[in-house]
Amino acid sequence: MNTLLSLHFFKKWPNRLKKEVVFKYVASENDLQAFLKRQIHQNDSLKRDWEDAQEKAHIETEHARREGFSILPISSSKYPDGLKVVPDPPMVLFGRGTWSGVKSPLAVVGTRKPTGYGKDFCRRLAVELSAYPINFVSGLALGIDAAIHREAMDMGATTTAFLAGGL
């Protein structure tokens, strides 16, 4: 997993290439390490950037351990299937809590400046749907995203937030 996290932080390759390497050319963590060693260690500039990425991965792993959150690589069976099919899914997800609630997602999309009606709609929706096995998903943006997330949490519903910048 540390190799995948290092690959996440390795900015010299586009995400498309990283995913191609992970899913088409390697079968295991050891295969990935061997592949990267062959490709990266032949170029001093890439080698320095790879070492920086490994250091960032180490720091992030320690931070996750201290703060109690987990790191889920795209190769994990727990990685949300729906997220794998978007054009550019993240190599890793950072989270706190359980990954089991990522099934049956419902996202509410709206403005960053909701009206009273919009906020009330979020409250009523959370009240009505919290009795069902639905996972309220948001990006925690200001406005409707945050409102539905907060209301769902107040009702004890399962929630998942995907943060663009990580934790």
Name every feature range the model reports, one short phrase each:
Residues 1-127:
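Short, positively charged patches
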